[in-house]
Amino acid sequence: MSSPERIFPGKYYLCLEPVKSMLKTKKMKSVIFNLLIITIMTCACTPKNAQDPAKWSDSEVKSWFDKGEWKQGWAVAPDASIDQREFAIQYHKNPEVWNKAFTFLKSTPLDTLSKGRHEIDGDFLYANADQYTTKNEEVAKFEAHRKYADIQYVISGNERIGVRPLADGEITEDYVDAKDVLFLKYADKNYQAADPGKFFIFFPADAHSPGVKADTNMVVHKVVLKVRIN
């Protein structure tokens, strides 16, 4: 076979070099473009599934919850009544606000909180602190909310909190939008002990009856963080 020099002698052969280089460049660009498309599609799909707790298995939900990074270093334990999957779903919808909530609980000297509302992030997140005497079971009411989730923590003292599914209750007072509350009653109250060693989280599907006396009526110092979810 004849060499390129014999077919295209001298300067004519040299003119082919840019053409050959351009062909190589176009081929390389095509390869790079295809790789970019594959990478973008992979990145677009994988994180979406990874960050959608509604699609996680029960073991994946438990692993994420038990790891506890979402607590932002707050040492208090979550109560076993917390709906772990619902919390994972709500957390991943708005991690910034939930992180602010637990950072507040970790970094604030809670025993110094005065009664009333404490601003954190406007109507998206705020804390209500209160001091009250626990009430007898017969006068306690179950309540539920639609716009906010509650993080409830007894700073000092102890009480019981009834925890029941909203769907199982009988409504005794209709929902009042201005107060974001409705009231219900249940035959089975399912009381859980609440003390400084653990905290509770209640979502719209969770009816709860806080402030019920444990062994005796006592003064309780408590903080409730209101986290906007709807």
Residue ranges and their predicted role:
Residues 1-56:
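Bacterial Sec-dependent N-terminal signal peptides
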Residues 49-50, 61-129, 139:
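A short, N-terminal "cap"/entry segment at the start of jelly-roll beta-barrel domains
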Residues 109-173:
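Mid-length scaffold segments of soluble, non-membrane domains
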Residues 159-194:
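A short beta-strand-loop-beta hairpin characteristic of the jelly-roll/cupin
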Residues 165, 204, 227-229:
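Short, structured patches in soluble enzyme cores that scaffold and shape functional sites
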Residues 193-211:
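Conserved metal-binding segment of the jelly-roll/cupin
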Residues 199, 217-230:
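A short hydrophobic beta-strand segment most commonly corresponding to one strand
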Residues 212-216:
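Short proline/glycine-enriched turn/loop segments at secondary-structure junctions
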